Amino acid sequence: EQAKELCAQRGVQLTPIRYQVLELVWDSHKAVKAYDLLDKIKPLQPAAKPATIYRALDFLLEQGLIHRIESLNAFVGCRHSGHPHEQLMLICKQCHEVEERPAPEVMRVLGDETVQARFSVHSRAIEIHGICAKCAVLADL
């Protein structure tokens, strides 16, 4: 519902296919690939094609409702949708869950470094791969 309200405030349309893709991304609780989304959408939207999914994903990215995990070529729901922000993504190599964390001090330092380097930043996201606490506990059993 928050996504619908946000889109209405911005004057953009959260179409049924966009909403279905958003729900699937959120329901997965893990990074999900576009073709996996297509497989899940097909029973609901038999005419859906890869371009359908990519257009929906592009819209959701533009609206800040999801994030792209570059290293996995996959997508996760944004926990802080509604306003632009930088994120630190902790990605579990075992279960593929992604935790979005605020990291204001890290981002401040990175900002200072890029200014000193006269580097024009287009987007900032840090992806860190490792083992989450749940998987670490399971490994110890």
Q: Which residues are covered by each model-predicted region?
A:
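Short, Lys/Arg-enriched N-terminal segment that forms or immediately precedes the first helix
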Residues: E1-G11
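Short capping segments at the starts of secondary-structure elements
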Residues: L14, D27-K33
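Pre-recognition alpha-helix immediately N-terminal to the DNA-recognition helix
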Residues: Y19-L24
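A short acidic, leucine-rich amphipathic alpha-helix
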Residues: D36-K42, I53
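Basic amphipathic alpha-helical segments that dock to polyanions
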Residues: I53-Q63
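Non-DNA-binding regulatory cores of transcription-related proteins
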Residues: E62-L141
